[in-house]
Design a protein with these regions (language model features):
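Short pre-active-site segment immediately N-terminal to the catalytic Zn-binding motif
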Residues: 45-53, 114-133, 181
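Active-site scaffold of zinc-dependent metalloenzymes
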Residues: 26-40, 99-125, 170-174
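The catalytic-center signature of Zn2+-dependent metalloproteases
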Residues: 88-107, 127-186
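Disordered inhibitory propeptide/activation segment of secreted metzincin zinc metalloprotease zymogens
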Residues: 1-50
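Short, well-structured beta-strand/strand-turn elements
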Residues: 63-85, 95-106, 112, 121-122, ...
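Acidic, glycine-rich low-complexity segments
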Residues: 22, 152-174, 179, 183-251
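Zn2+-dependent metallopeptidase catalytic core
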Residues: 39-79, 224, 230-235
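Surface-exposed patches in mature extracellular/periplasmic domains of secreted proteins
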Residues: 2-8, 12-17, 68-80, 147-151, ...
């Protein structure tokens, strides 16, 4: 259910994956003027390019994503191509900090518009703008809000209230604190991105050992190798599944 709460359906995940085919490449651009396909839309209102600091921070998020997924991000000057993240600012409603479009074949897919607002002045780590930025990039890669039902799936596509927090997923609206104002996806976000695009095959590629902790969440992912999950230091039993779709637990 934690995948359904961020992606929706298998069909949705397959659709996003097929957009990039086998290349695992997504392009990104910071246009100096509004893209032609958005010129007559609300996106053009107050259109403002990213400044250098904002560009650096957006690229830093993409670099983080490359470390945990099989995706590669390549700069381009062409916003019209599909599979392209377009970053810009514009004028939005008073209560809106940003919005982004889910991936699709139309060039508008994966476009990200940050509001011209003090929150988004730099989008640097330690500011609320950092969380807003990575949240919108999550949308542009196919992630939804965990509290919103996916069409036709009902409650199975909603994260339980006790798990719906920014500590688990940056796509959440709940329990946001300064500790979450960073360029790192939560463990549920990473699981969802792995499901769509696959893990980075070069990360954790050795024969690794993962020790299970009884005091914190154990989230394990691995790129390759013959790996070991070690619970020998625990004083209580462990319920552990090797099949997908389970929450394992200690005690």
């Amino acid at each position: 259910y934690w995948l359904s709460s961020l992606i929706g359906s298998q069909e949705t995940a397959d659709g996003y994956s097929k957009l990039i085919e086998d290349s695992k490449t997504i392009f990104y651009t910071f246009p100096e003027s509004v893209p032609v396909y958005s010129a007559a839309t609300e996106m053009a209102e107050g259109f403002t390019p990213f400044n250098d600091i904002q560009k650096q921070n957006a690229i830093a998020v993409l670099k983080h994503i490359e470390t945990v997924t099989a995706l590669s991000f390549v700069p381009t000057s062409e916003a019209l191509e599909s599979n392209t993240l377009v970053f810009a600012l514009n004028t939005q409603e008073e209560d809106s900090y940003a919005y982004a479009y889910l991936p699709e074949i139309h060039p508008l897919g994966s476009d990200i518009y940050m509001a011209i607002h003090p929150t988004n002045e730099t989008m640097s780590v330690g500011t609320e703008g950092a969380l807003t930025l990575i949240h919108e990039i999550g949308h542009a890669l196919g992630l939804k809000h965990p509290h919103e039902e996916a069409e036709g799936l009902g409650e199975v596509s909603v994260l339980p209230a006790d798990e719906d927090s920014v500590a688990n997923t940056v796509m959440s609206y709940e329990e946001s604190t300064v500790e979450n104002f960073k360029f790192e996806f939560g463990h549920l976000d990473i699981a969802a991105l792995h499901y769509i695009y696959g893990p980075n095959p070069n990360a954790r590629a050795s024969d690794d050992t993962y020790e299970i902790s009884s005091t914190q969440t154990n989230f394990i992912w691995d790129g390759a190798g013959v790996d070991t999950v070690d619970a020998s230091k625990l004083e209580t039993g462990v319920t552990f599944h090797l099949t997908p779709g389970h929450h394992d637990f200690v005690g």
